[in-house]
């Protein structure tokens, strides 16, 4: 079979690229070896947010008493929740498949391998195309093998958790690890967070991070900074986690969330001119073209900004550029709003003061913090902190960093003010 475009990977970026290319009249096929929707739908934002909403409901119950409500102790049917979560993901899988079918995009089930720059093999069949887009996404980074990885779960595994543990050790200091730490802590799990660095969320504003740590209710999350999991042993009833700082932790479940890596293995890229970066992500130019003129890449596989809206925008831009006769609008990924689903949430867009200084911009900060009226009846700490980074020269806003309830929604609106 010959196509104008073959997309490898039916995640958010790949599906958008395929759909837009088809709208422009291209003959398109898409290859997928798993479920439609990619990381976001199956093992990312969607199930993560469902976990988060579940945990927030439990957290809210604690605050109802402050308003005079008398509520019997609730019980969680974890198996029912997981069943409903899986049903929701299946619904979204079908929506993605429907988008492809309605746009007359051929679906090829299996794993693609390049034979050369114009041809791939899927199973026993070969397919040709004038252009290829690789959108195979990423996968969890696997911890060091000496840590007895059979006892360690990844951020993909967490979504098939059969029962809620009483104790959990999470290794990692990025947003994935921190989100899960707060999710499970708010579900009543005793969480120990292990991170090799001095500060969690190191790419975020340090004052925001400090505020988050101070907002953590006592006893819910214990932080073990400047340490790593060195070894894991199993006793009759416990997992024994040995840390590099010589401390030992007993737990029921271990989650490794030490980052994600690009999915570039077994694609047959050695049969093309595609080059990889040191971290195995695909090297592209600003128009997402690889070193092979026929092959492009978008989304997490290029390890630029690993967010679903970014992958969608990249796929849309690229399909317009390749198959639309009209001049495409240049993209700008300078100020991308980002959220972290903690308690309270973090929202950020633009530069921190440290970033501004590195860019040799003379800037200053405006900050405020307070407790919202909703929380004044409860015994929670201050739950809201806002920070603006201002250009001293022209008073424009360079960055906005907030921590509060609904910060993930607020930052979308506030982002339009950042230049």
Provide a role label for each language-model segment.
Residues 1-11, 164-174:
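Beta1/beta-strand and adjacent pyrophosphate-binding region of the FAD-binding site
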Residues 2-3, 19-26, 31-164, 197-201, ...:
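Glycine-rich flavin
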Residues 6-13, 17-34, 39, 46, ...:
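Flexible, glycine-rich terminal cap/loop adjacent to redox cofactors
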Residues 6-8, 112, 127-137, 170-171, ...:
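Short hydrophobic core segments
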Residues 14, 174-177, 311:
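Catalytic nucleophile loop
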Residues 18, 22, 181-186:
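Gly/Ala-rich phosphate-binding loop of Rossmann-like dinucleotide-binding domains
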Residues 109, 113-121, 187-286:
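A Rossmann-like FAD-binding core segment of flavoenzymes
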């Amino acid at each position: 079979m010959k196509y104008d475009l073959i997309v490898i990977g039916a995640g958010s970026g790949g599906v958008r690229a395929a759909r837009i290319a088809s709208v422009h009249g291209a003959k398109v096929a898409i290859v997928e070896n798993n479920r439609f929707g990619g990381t976001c739908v199956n093992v990312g934002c969607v199930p993560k947010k469902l976990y988060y909403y579940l945990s927030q409901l439990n957290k809210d119950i604690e605050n109802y008493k402050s308003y005079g409500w008398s509520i019997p102790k609730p019980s969680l049917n974890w198996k029912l929740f997981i069943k409903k979560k899986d049903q929701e993901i299946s619904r979204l899988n079908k929506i993605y498949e429907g988008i492809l079918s309605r746009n007359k995009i051929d679906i090829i089930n299996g794993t693609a391998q390049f034979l050369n720059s114009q041809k791939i093999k899927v199973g026993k069949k070969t397919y040709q195309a004038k252009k290829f887009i690789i959108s195979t996404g990423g996968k969890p980074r696997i911890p060091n093998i000496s840590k007895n990885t059979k006892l360690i779960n990844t951020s993909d595994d967490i979504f098939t958790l059969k029962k809620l543990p009483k104790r959990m050790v999470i290794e990692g200091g990025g947003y994935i690890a921190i989100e899960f730490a707060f999710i499970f802590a708010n579900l009543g799990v005793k969480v120990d967070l292990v991170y090799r660095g001095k500060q969690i969320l190191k790419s975020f504003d340090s004052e925001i991070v400090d505020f988050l740590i101070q907002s953590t209710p006592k006893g819910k999350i214990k932080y073990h900074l400047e340490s790593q999991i060195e070894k894991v042993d199993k006793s009759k009833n416990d997992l024994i986690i040995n840390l590099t700082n010589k401390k030992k932790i007993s737990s029921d479940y271990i989650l490794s969330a030490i980052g994600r890596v690009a999915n570039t293995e077994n694609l047959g890229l050695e049969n093309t001119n595609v080059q990889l970066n040191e971290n195995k992500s695909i090297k592209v130019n600003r128009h997402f073209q690889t070193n092979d003129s026929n092959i492009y890449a978008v989304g997490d596989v290029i390890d630029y900004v690993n967010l679903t809206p970014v992958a969608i925008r990249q796929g849309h831009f690229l399909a317009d550029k390749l198959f639309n006769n009209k001049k495409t609008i240049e993209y700008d990924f300078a100020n991308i709003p980002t959220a972290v689903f903690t308690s309270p949430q973090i929202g950020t867009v633009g530069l921190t003061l440290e970033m501004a200084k590195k860019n040799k911009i003379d800037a200053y900060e405006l900050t405020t913090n307070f407790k919202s009226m909703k929380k004044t009846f409860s015994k929670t700490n201050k739950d809201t902190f806002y920070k603006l980074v201002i250009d001293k020269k022209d008073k424009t806003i360079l960055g906005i960093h907030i921590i509060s309830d609904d910060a993930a929604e607020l930052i979308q609106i506030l982002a339009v003010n950042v230049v």
